[in-house]
Curated annotation (Swiss-Prot):
PROSITE patterns membership: IGFBP_N_1, IGFBP_N_2, THYROGLOBULIN_1_1, THYROGLOBULIN_1_2
Biological-process GO terms, alphabetical: cellular response to hormone stimulus; female pregnancy; osteoblast differentiation; positive regulation of activated T cell proliferation; regulation of insulin-like growth factor receptor signaling pathway; response to estradiol; response to estrogen; response to glucocorticoid
Name of protein: Insulin-like growth factor-binding protein 2
SUPFAM superfamilies attached to this UniProt entry: Growth factor receptor domain, Thyroglobulin type-1 domain
Protein species of origin: Mus musculus
Predominant location category: secreted
Entry-linked CDD domains: TY (cd00191)
Gene field: Igfbp2
Keywords: Disulfide bond, Glycoprotein, Growth factor binding, Growth regulation, Secreted, Signal
Amino acid sequence: MLPRLGGPALPLLLPSLLLLLLLGAGGCGPGVRAEVLFRCPPCTPERLAACGPPPDAPCAELVREPGCGCCSVCARQEGEACGVYIPRCAQTLRCYPNPGSELPLKALVTGAGTCEKRRVGTTPQQVADSDDDHSEGGLVENHVDGTMNMLGGGSSAGRKPLKSGMKELAVFREKVNEQHRQMGKGAKHLSLEEPKKLRPPPARTPCQQELDQVLERISTMRLPDDRGPLEHLYSLHIPNCDKHGRYNLKQCKMSLNGQRGECWCVNPNTGKPIQGAPTIRGDPECHLFYNEQQETGGAHAQSVQ
């Protein structure tokens, strides 16, 4: 069994960590061998040296950056937000979509998940039967072995692993399509029983529209080879939207090949890059450039008047 991620053992552990796409929330049951569909490249000494010093703030636990990053960050604790772009949950926790989420996968992509204690004793079928909103389960991030689950909703004990990445992605695509079908049925039901109370859905923001396009592309993605779905997912830019549907100031590519992704600053309404802001592998401090842009725009408006 591997020791916990953190402390002096961290550089020795990173080269052996794997990024897995599994069925089941939090790993496989007894006697079931997990199928490796995508393996993160090893963290070379050069990549580790580029990380710099560990976080200044005291951390209860250090974990790897999201994706295939090699640098260490503070783990999120129970009750804190989690998702694709947000640091991983602590070792004993898992990232789940909030109860009642209409699109659990989308909630996790946008960082609207919550770190919770691992849910035990629930099979994927039981989750689907008890609540359609949870049919996609949670994005599980195991910070000892790097496991990520984008499909399962509970324990996978007794469940046979899929034998090909194509089958894995087919199940994934079907679950995404099922969400859209369920939403359509709900809208028809409301229109028949409560025509007076039915309100038109709010207009989708540019960030939400871009995210919809990415999710649609994922739902129709095909595997031309045996590299696995995660490698194709890393080639996509998933927009980072806030809870109001606006672009977050900082947008980043996912970490890959042991190197953190590039980050840049955008206008929260349009998603267009802020002029003068850098594109770096780190924090470009977007709030400074956005505030400067706002002040410049306000001064220009006053001069025109």
